[in-house]
Amino acid sequence: MANIKSKIKSIKTMEKARKRNSMIKSRVKTSIKKAKLAITQDSDNAKKLVSDAHHEIHKAKSKGVFHKNTALRKSSRLDLFFNKHMKSA
């Protein structure tokens, strides 16, 4: 544990940010899983769930949780998965 007052405060701030970031990352992972599940089951609302997942990914990018390229990669892989399964269906 830090002894300096400013470091104690910065540790508290970092902990808040870590919790917030992990919550946002979890939300992104969940939305991607839901979208992929809907795609594989040929669900009617798959397109909407993919759109929701893109929204969550880009929101995480704008909040600084993901780097720009990471967000683009996640979106791109989800689109590839969607297009591959829609073409075969």
Curated annotation (Swiss-Prot):
Query: What biological process terms from GO does the record include?
Result: translation
Q: Give GO terms: molecular function aspect only.
A: small ribosomal subunit rRNA binding; structural constituent of ribosome
Keyword annotations for this protein, in alphabetical order, are: Ribonucleoprotein, Ribosomal protein, RNA-binding, rRNA-binding
Bias kind Basic residues: ranges = 1-10, 17-29
Query: What family is this?
Result: Belongs to the bacterial ribosomal protein bS20 family.
Q: What does this protein do?
A: Binds directly to 16S ribosomal RNA.
Under HAMAP family, the record lists: Ribosomal_bS20
Query: What is the recorded name of this protein?
Result: Small ribosomal subunit protein bS20
Protein's organism: Mycoplasmopsis pulmonis (strain UAB CTIP)
Q: What is the lineage of its organism?
A: Bacteria, Bacillati, Mycoplasmatota, Mycoplasmoidales, Metamycoplasmataceae
